[in-house]
Amino acid sequence: MQDESSETHSSGNMSFWHHLAELRNTLLRIAIVLIVLAVLFFILMPYIFDYVILAPCSPDFPIYRLFDHIGGDGVFVPDLSSSSKSIELININLGTQLMTQMSSSFYLALIVGFPVVIYLLWCFIRPGLYPKERRGARRAFIFGNLMFYLGMFVAYILIFPLILRFLAEYQLSERIANTITLDSYMDTFYLIMLSFGLIFEMPLLIWLLGRFGIITRRFFSRYRRHAIFGTLVLAALITPTGDPFSLFIVFAPLYALWEFSALLVPKGTDNDGGETEESASAEA
């Protein structure tokens, strides 16, 4: 404890130019990490595309096989019988495939290297924090990364395939054939992946607000019904097929985030009336 306090004290005595030099070295390390990862992913990109990014185009993708095993009737469970066909992508612009390989390498380097980037930044600011602040920041770092990757996993294995199948097979008229471009596919893929990664950061945000006393458990007890309704609406918008089964499997993880967030808020009295969590629950 004394060593950590002395480290914090000594960091406060560092000159401005020394801090600037440390920041420069930190940014240089971050750039090296991202460049190395980007080059590695650029080399491996053909395999990553075939076995990861384009996997939802295949009829053998796990969620399609699950619905096929259940036997969708189109009413309660989506009918994905047409999913026996692979979704074909086309490229209509010269150089698009090369640019897609380069941009995807950069995006993947950011996603995979994000924990390393945060860790290097953490090493830079750590000497200026108190021990209690360090422990809180360390928990937030680990928890935030886990939730971000969990959100992307849910989007990849569940949300994106359902949206892809629906939009790829939807027809305004039989005279209009769907021809999906590579750009359109990649834009939708990254949008959904990153969106759900950020959505799953909600528990971390709630935890931080709870630590600062901005939000309490009474809030979750009071607005639980509103949360259920809002999550159902969001799940209905995300689930284009509209069947109850797809709606439920999208609704379940989203609503679980709400309840999980409530558990992260510290117990105690409310700011506005001093009511305890038990009295708020009794009112609900």
PLM segments and residue spans:
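Membrane topogenic/interface segments and analogous intrinsically disordered interaction regions
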Residues: 1-284
